[in-house]
Curated annotation (Swiss-Prot):
Subunit structure: Heterodimer of an alpha subunit and a beta subunit. PSII is composed of 1 copy each of membrane proteins PsbA, PsbB, PsbC, PsbD, PsbE, PsbF, PsbH, PsbI, PsbJ, PsbK, PsbL, PsbM, PsbT, PsbX, PsbY, PsbZ, Psb30/Ycf12, peripheral proteins PsbO, CyanoQ (PsbQ), PsbU, PsbV and a large number of cofactors. It forms dimeric complexes.
Protein name from the UniProt record: Cytochrome b559 subunit alpha
Function field: This b-type cytochrome is tightly associated with the reaction center of photosystem II (PSII). PSII is a light-driven water:plastoquinone oxidoreductase that uses light energy to abstract electrons from H(2)O, generating O(2) and a proton gradient subsequently used for ATP formation. It consists of a core antenna complex that captures photons, and an electron transfer chain that converts photonic excitation into a charge separation.
Source species: Acaryochloris marina (strain MBIC 11017)
Membrane topology listed for this record: Single-pass membrane protein
Transmembrane listed as a keyword: yes
Length: 83
């Protein structure tokens, strides 16, 4: 047997003017904030990922692939030695 939770029905919320006034402002602002977060480079700094021009330096232009399962630790140490 189902009962009422006392919450407003979703249909009432979506059709209210207050809902649309609030969301026509907040949803575009969320997209704008996300775009600024990525375009300014702050996302790279916060999450510690390298920028697109920092993946490869002049000394190493190839991909650092681990090719041997049992010597993987040694290969990773060789890759990170120059960093």
């Amino acid at each position: 047997m189902s009962g009422r939770t006392g919450e407003r029905p979703f249909g009432d919320i979506v059709t209210s003017i207050r809902y649309w006034i609030i969301h026509t402002i907040t949803v575009p602002m969320l997209f704008l904030a996300g775009w600024l977060f990525v375009s300014t480079g702050l996302a790279y700094d916060v999450f510690g990922t390298p920028r697109p021009n920092e993946y490869f330096d002049q000394a190493r232009q190839g991909l650092p692939l681990v090719t041997d399962r049992y010597e993987g630790k040694q290969q990773i140490d060789e890759f990170t030695k120059g960093l």
